[in-house]
């Protein structure tokens, strides 16, 4: 997201296109490590923090446990905690957010500050398959274990998604107090349960 104009997102399509073009022009390559070897696009094989010193980690200000791949081109805010998780190219993880064990931040998704993305949960990306809008998790959101939020859905500030929620653009979100049905956006300070 380049910026918000009122409540509308302005997307910088040129950046998304540049990332997608990089997949076509860079060759595949091999990288061997202590546990395995990997075969991927050469420019993505080494993670964002490959060869960082202790001082560089301290300056970045986030905690990163072993086996937490963070691809180049992503952003991790201060005081974020990355348990063994996966952060794809272009993803934005806000300050103070926890990416819990085996959670995933998809390409170019936006996760706000002080969020908790619980174990096994996924926040969808925009590159594969190509999507028009990124998935956005606003500040102070809790996403329960084994949940998926995809297809450019926006989860409003302060919301809680219970365990096992699957939310895409076609998912009906029902306001229990008035029966109103929305799609594509979870209103701020909502509590969402599947069913």
Segment roles from a protein language model:
Residues 1-6, 10:
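Single conserved hydrophobic/aromatic residue that forms the stacking wall/gate
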Residues 9, 24, 28, 164-168:
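Generic secondary-structure signature for well-ordered alpha-helical cores
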Residues 15-61:
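A contiguous, low-structure linker/loop signature
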Residues 58, 62-194:
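Structural signal for interior beta-strand "rungs" in well-ordered beta-sheet cores
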């Amino acid at each position: 997201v380049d910026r918000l104009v009122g409540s509308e997102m302005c997307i910088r399509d040129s950046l998304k296109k540049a990332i997608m073009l990089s997949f076509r022009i860079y060759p595949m390559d091999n990288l061997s490590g202590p546990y395995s070897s990997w075969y991927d696009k050469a420019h993505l094989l080494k993670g964002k923090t490959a060869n960082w010193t202790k001082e560089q980690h301290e300056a970045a200000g986030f905690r990163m446990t072993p086996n937490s791949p963070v691809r180049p081109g992503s952003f991790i805010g201060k005081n974020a905690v990355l348990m063994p998780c996966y952060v794809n190219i272009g993803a934005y993880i806000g300050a103070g957010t926890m990416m819990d064990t085996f959670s995933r931040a998809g390409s170019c998704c936006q996760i706000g500050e002080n969020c908790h993305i619980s174990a096994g949960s996924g926040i969808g990306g925009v590159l594969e398959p190509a999507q028009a809008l990124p998935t956005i998790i606003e500040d102070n959101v809790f996403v329960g274990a084994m949940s998926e939020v995809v297809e450019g859905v926006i989860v409003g500030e302060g919301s809680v998604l219970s365990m096992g929620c699957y939310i895409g653009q076609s998912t009906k979100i029902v306001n229990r107090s008035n029966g109103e049905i929305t799609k594509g956006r979870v209103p701020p300070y909502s509590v969402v349960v599947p069913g």
